[in-house]
Amino acid sequence: MQHRPQLFYTTAPAPCPYLPDRTERKVLTELAGPDAVALHNRLSQAGFRRSHAIAYAPVCVGCRACTPMRIPAATFAPTRTQKKIRSRHTDLVVNIIPPVPTDEQFRLFEMYQAVRHPDGDMAHMCWRDYAELIANTPVETFLAEFRRPDGTLVCVSLMDRLSDGLSAVYTFYDVNDLTASWGTFSILWLIEETARLGLEHLYLGYYVPGSPKMAYKAAFGPPEVFRDGQWSLLAALSPA
């Protein structure tokens, strides 16, 4: 049986969403067919990310700032502040469910985008776009819904299961309570869930030195980053 070659494409240059006065380009490929899960695993371990049925990675000319990052669950050491955030939400009910979009999730998503990313592309997403973000996946994907004891939905994390870990695809949350630190809490929970499942790493996407949007990721240590074809501790990362 002949296998068709895996095709990769390069996008046209576009404004960088993370650093001013820079241009981004991506290489992408479709995740489809019986080998989609295996391909997703290999590409994730090589620094790619998933959106819908597409795996992508930055290939920007003259810039290597976007650095794939993952957290080794076994050696993760929460800071004192992170421990306080975790203990603050011990009453939350967490439900892990299939990637099925709901109106309740979408309302939370819209409020999150309007406050946190009003100028981003996702701020203009309609219900159909949101449903595609959640449900269009060729791999093993789940949602974690975080609810208060009264049932109020406060945070949602979309995650993929890989052969060696979990991949945090997208998280959104209640922006009305700034003291809750839902973003930090969700990452702490995902690290714990990675360990609970007996997996090694939580893949966090791209760390971008100099980008305020991505600075929070360096707080979860000790993280590993992927550069020059290998994973190494962030402390060994040279400037981009």
From Swiss-Prot:
Gene: bpt
Cellular compartment(s): Cytoplasm
Domain of life the protein comes from: Bacteria
Stated role: Functions in the N-end rule pathway of protein degradation where it conjugates Leu from its aminoacyl-tRNA to the N-termini of proteins containing an N-terminal aspartate or glutamate.
Coiled coil location: none
A GO term from the CC aspect: cytoplasm
Keyword vocabulary terms for this entry: Acyltransferase, Cytoplasm, Transferase
Name of one Pfam family that matches: ATE_C
Biological processes, Gene Ontology terms: ubiquitin-dependent protein catabolic process via the N-end rule pathway
A molecular-function term among this protein's GO annotations: leucyl-tRNA--protein transferase activity
Similarity comment text for this entry: Belongs to the R-transferase family. Bpt subfamily.
Catalytic activity: N-terminal L-glutamyl-[protein] + L-leucyl-tRNA(Leu) = N-terminal L-leucyl-L-glutamyl-[protein] + tRNA(Leu) + H(+); N-terminal L-aspartyl-[protein] + L-leucyl-tRNA(Leu) = N-terminal L-leucyl-L-aspartyl-[protein] + tRNA(Leu) + H(+)
EC identifiers of the protein: 2.3.2.29
First-tier enzyme category under EC: transferase
UniProt name for this protein: Aspartate/glutamate leucyltransferase
